[in-house]
Amino acid sequence: AGAASPSDRVVSAGSATTTALCLLLQILSERFGIECGSMTSIHAYTSDQALQDYAGSDFRRSRSAAKNIIPNSHEAGLWLGDILPAFDGKILTSALNVPVREGCLLDVNLVMEDAAVTAEDINEAMRAGAASHPGVVGVVEDPIVYSDVIGDARSLLFDTKGTIKAGNNIIKTLSWYENLGHAARLLDVVRLYAKLDKREAA
């Protein structure tokens, strides 16, 4: 978090999941009060997972990634407070690694401060957020599945069909994203620092 400077020597673009979660929370918190929530990233299996079962100290991560849904921890919650301080310690994060090659689905459940907020209010806020973050945030109105978003370089594709209100003030949301979006944000960071270097040289 904080302004970029030519004096920076180590920078990070976070992760695909952290970026998607932060975009969602930033957009919604600008319109509504959010008390707390939880996030589950339904995530393609990764290069550090085994393709076949083996004898390991972590019984879950030593199982075949290509054959299992594997509950896992996620560090997005640790970084969230650095990026959006208002949410420090307020969002529980976890992951399910599933046997697909790429891509993720973000399942976020939020406890809203105002019980009057509806599912359509959330969808409208995300449509407005997509309009103000072109090329980074998108909204999907059709009943899609993951293969429909492969090749999309946006970091968050909010699925309006997945927004549900439960009880008085709980909102469930679904959003799609894939690693291409994270690669695009890495390029954005490189371009930003390239511009800063040119300004300093001038």
What are these regions (language model features)?
Residues 14-15, 69-71, 176:
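Hydrophobic alpha-helical scaffolding
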Residues 33-36, 41-170:
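C-terminal substrate-binding/catalytic lobe of Rossmann-fold NAD(P)-dependent oxidoreductases
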Residues 21, 77, 105, 183-186:
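A general structural signal for well-ordered alpha-helical segments in protein cores
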Residues 19, 114-117, 181:
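A generic structural signal for alpha-helix starts
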